[in-house]
Amino acid sequence: MIPQQQPSGMPFHRYQPFKPVDLPDRTWPSKTITKAPRWLSTDLRDGNQALIEPMDTERKREIFDLLVRMGYKEIEVGFPAASQTDYDFVRYLIEEDRIPDDVQISVLTQAREELIERTVQSLVGAKRATVHLYNATSPEFRRIVFGVNREECKGIAVEGTRTVLKFAEQYLKDTEYFGYEYSPEIFIDTELEFALEVCEAVMDVYQPGPDREIILNLPATVERATPNVYADQIEWMSRNLSRREYVCLSVHPHNDRGTAVAAAELAVMAGADRVEGCLFGHGERTGNVCLVTLGLNLFSQGIDPMIDFSNIDEIRRTVEHCTQLPVNPRHPYGGDLVYTAFSGSHQDAIKKGFHALEADAAAAGVPVDEYRWNMPYLPIDPKDVGRTYEAVIRVNSQSGKGGVSYVLQRDYSIDLPRRLQIEFSRVVQQFADAEGGEFSGERIWEIFTDTYLSEGVVGVMAYRSETSEDGEYCISADVRLRGEIREITGTGNGPISAFVDALAGVGFKLRVLDYSEHALSEGGDARAAAYVEAEVDGNVLWGVGISSNITTASLKAVCSAVNRAQQS
């Protein structure tokens, strides 16, 4: 019988399940995402305010410039009324002409008149700007934090919108495009009908219409429920909002339950037009939804994210430098280890996948880097985001033949026969168990050369050969035998069999079971590798030889097998 789980003893009774949305005819489960939503980066606002040490102007500029290079067209640049630093940064961007003509900056404000005025003042001189107003609408915040009823809460949003329009008319007459965004904060905990009522009241004031879009942003300020519940909420709002064609329905998922990415994707399926988030998921508590993950999830499905992630390491380094927080090595798409396999079975599958990709691309007459990607364990080609294949397969005690042989082939052009892969992986495994940790390509090569290419009791120095009239191959070889140079002779149907015959004359009896060879590089002076599987005194083992002459490499491989038999 399977052991039965026992009660935890934790006070789970203190918590209540989230109420589902009554939406029996929901349509989002049958939808698919076919294009990228509009993106807004809030790295400089929501991301920045959650840092242990908020960014100074120089680091903010680095993030802003990065976002522009990547292709973000909507960037929330601060909370000007909350701090002088934020205000000064907005002024810096405008006065130093740092904002491209096709980028819309956004600033956040609470719904108090003096804060709204200072916020709008910060935008004077901007060509394109959005004011983002919010107030909390959930029952808990109405009752506990602000002590207001529904009508008073709605009144805050309505009056705040009027105030934004008043100051925009006063200060932003020269702005080419003025945008307005409203967020019922804590939307996810707000009664849906009340959230709709507030948004409708805000629209009544703003009067959206042709060329006068309103952004209604519906935040999962604290992630409370499974992503499907958030999707139901978004679909319900999308269905019931009037003037929907003039509304950009935006979502702002947080990651408190660890499902912000799924929540955002389902929300887009449910009708959201726009997603707000941060690079690598920075933000309050567990962070905002990760824009990197969302974008590259689309990319992995053959959809253009409309954002350039082709140098993921530059993006990560910039974010780490500016936030002074590291990106987790396991973070999707951007972490150090996300394209790395240590497990032997994973490594073997990836190695075979690369061989199949090269073969399929060649058969189709298409360059490998343009052929359809279909690779075990790797959802995207690391090269498409600026990574190399160097770290795809790394070797430790969990690695098998696939990983070890892949590293040798990648770094040293050594293409081991399958049975030799198995034999050598056992050798590496012994070292890995003894030494622990990860093995570099250099360490694997060191073990390989010590095992197969080092000097032993016998080594070939030179040889001479001829073929008799009846086709028999005759060899005369100078060999180093236990420190002395000896000449040995033998005959056979080829150089290997003749050399084996010669070795038998000095006491080394072996039977060759398999042989393979390949060039290590191209050109007239290319070296070759030869592999010999032999039975020596009842033991089956492999020998390896490397030389600029393929016959010499073959004879060295025979000597390697003999030497390994002597050591075993």
Curated annotation (Swiss-Prot):
Keyword Ribosomal protein: no
Residues binding Mg(2+), per UniProt: 46, 252, 254, 288
GO CC entries: cytoplasm
Keywords: Amino-acid biosynthesis, Branched-chain amino acid biosynthesis, Cytoplasm, Leucine biosynthesis, Magnesium, Metal-binding, Transferase
UniProt pathway annotation: Amino-acid biosynthesis; L-leucine biosynthesis; L-leucine from 3-methyl-2-oxobutanoate: step 1/4
A single MF term (Gene Ontology): acetyl-CoA C-acetyltransferase activity
Catalytic function, reaction form: 3-methyl-2-oxobutanoate + acetyl-CoA + H2O = (2S)-2-isopropylmalate + CoA + H(+)
UniProt keyword Magnesium, yes or no: yes
GO biological process: L-leucine biosynthetic process
Domain Pyruvate carboxyltransferase: 37-313
Places the protein is found: Cytoplasm
Top EC class of this enzyme: transferase
Gene3D superfamilies linked: 3.30.160.270, Aldolase class I
Cofactors: Mg(2+)
Regulatory domain: annotated segments: 455-568
Enzyme Commission code: 2.3.3.13
Family under the similarity heading: Belongs to the alpha-IPM synthase/homocitrate synthase family. LeuA type 2 subfamily.
Subunit structure: Homodimer.
NCBIfam families: leuA_yeast, PRK03739.1
Xref: PANTHER family: 2-ISOPROPYLMALATE SYNTHASE, PTHR46911
Function: Catalyzes the condensation of the acetyl group of acetyl-CoA with 3-methyl-2-oxobutanoate (2-ketoisovalerate) to form 3-carboxy-3-hydroxy-4-methylpentanoate (2-isopropylmalate).
The protein's name: 2-isopropylmalate synthase
Taxonomic placement: Bacteria, Bacillati, Actinomycetota, Actinomycetes, Streptosporangiales
